[in-house]
Regions:
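N-terminal secretory signal peptides and thylakoid transit peptides that target proteins
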Residues: 8-29
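N-terminal pre-domain segments of enzymes
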Residues: 46-57
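Mature-region segments of soluble proteins
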Residues: 2-9, 13, 56-58, 64-74, ...
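Hydrophobic alpha-helical segments, especially transmembrane helices
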Residues: 19-20, 37, 165, 192
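Boundary at the C-terminal end of the N-terminal hydrophobic targeting segment
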Residues: 35-42
Length: 259
C-alpha cells in the first residue's frame, strides 16, 4: 500500500537502531544518477541496450525538479548509506519511491486532517502545520540549498559527505531556518520516507530487488507458511516475494480504490 504514515510530530525523531543515524563506514560516495553503460560506444558505433525500466539510476522524477531530486538522492543516501550490510538509499530506489509517493493522495495531504485552525500545541496533539508532504519538500529543499550556497558556495548535493552530515544534523536539531517550516519537522518527514522506501514493497518504487528485505531476512508477501509453522529454530530457506506488478499501485484506478 502507499504510505499511510502519520504526519511528522514536533518531537525529536527517535534514534535509528540498526545502522544508527548517519551510520555506515563503508562506501559513502554517491551513486551516479546516470549510468555510463547507457552511452553508445563511439569507437565501433555499437548501440548499447536501453537501461531496464526498473533501474533506479535511470529514473526521471515526476514530482520533483531535477535540482530537488538531486538533493533528495544525496540526503537519502546519507540517512541510509551503503555499508557492509547492503546497498544504500539510492541503489534501493528510495528517491524514486518518495517522488512517486508525492503524486498520491498521501503526498497531497489528502489522508491527513488539514483544516484550520493551525495552532502551536503540545506534541501529544499531533501535527499542527498546514503543509502536506508535497509542501514540506517543496518548501524546505530550496532554503536548504540556499543555506549551503551561503556557507559553502555549493548546493547540498555538491558538498562533501562530512558537510552534508552537518546540514542534516542542523535540520534534525531544528537549527536551520526554512521559512515557516520547522527544520526538525522536515527532517522527520525525510527520514521517515527514506526508511519507508528502503523497506517498502518493490511495487512502490523502493526496496529495489528486495534488497532491503534480504538484509533483514524478511520473507515479504509470501502467501503460505504452513510448512514452516512447527519447525522451531529451522532457517527459512526461501527468498522474499513481492506483490504482483499488476495492478500498478500508482495508477488512477488503484488510488481511487484505496481512497
Amino acid at each position: 500500500m502507499t504510505s499511510s504514515s502519520s504526519p511528522p510530530s514536533h518531537d525529536a525523531p527517535a534514534p535509528l537502531s540498526r545502522r544508527g543515524f548517519m551510520g555506515g563506514a563503508a562506501s559513502l560516495s554517491s551513486i551516479p544518477l546516470l549510468s555510463h553503460a547507457a552511452r553508445a560506444d563511439e569507437k565501433d558505433g555499437k548501440q548499447q541496450p536501453a537501461p531496464p525500466d526498473d533501474d533506479p539510476a535511470h529514473y526521471r522524477p515526476v514530482f520533483f525538479s531535477a535540482e530537488e531530486y538531486l538533493f533528495l538522492c544525496h540526503a537519502c543516501e546519507r540517512i541510509f548509506p551503503q555499508d557492509e550490510n547492503g546497498p544504500g538509499a539510492q541503489a534501493l530506489g528510495v528517491p524514486r519511491f518518495i517522488d512517486r509517493q508525492m503524486t498520491t493522495p498521501y503526498g497531497r495531504g489528502d489522508l491527513w486532517y488539514m483544516k484550520a485552525p493551525f495552532v502551536n500545541g503540545p506534541p501529544e496533539l499531533g501535527y499542527q502545520l498546514p503543509y502536506s508532504p508535497q509542501d514540506l519538500y517543496r518548501g524546505a529543499i530550496t532554503p536548504i540549498n540556499t543555506h549551503c550556497l551561503m556557507l559553502h558556495d555549493a548546493v547540498f548535493a555538491a558538498l562533501s559527505p562530512q558537510w552534508q552530515d552537518e546540514v542534516l544534523h542542523a535540520l534534525e536539531d531544528n537549527r536551520l531556518h526554512l521559512n515557516d517550516i520547522p527544520s526538525a519537522v522536515f527532517f522527520e518527514q525525510l527520514r521517515t520516507n527514506t526508511l519507508e522506501g528502503a523497506f517498502s514493497d518493490p511495487a512502490y518504487g523502493g526496496n529495489h530487488n528486495m534488497a532491503g528485505w534480504k538484509m533483514m531476512d524478511f520473507p515479504g508477501a509470501r502467501a503460505d507458511f504452513m510448512d514452516w509453522i512447527n519447525q522451531d529454530g529451522a532457517r527459512y530457506p526461501l527468498g522474499p516475494v513481492g506483490m504482483p506488478p499488476k495492478p500498478d499501485p500508482y495508477s488512477a484506478s488503484f488510488q481511487n480504490e484505496e481512497g
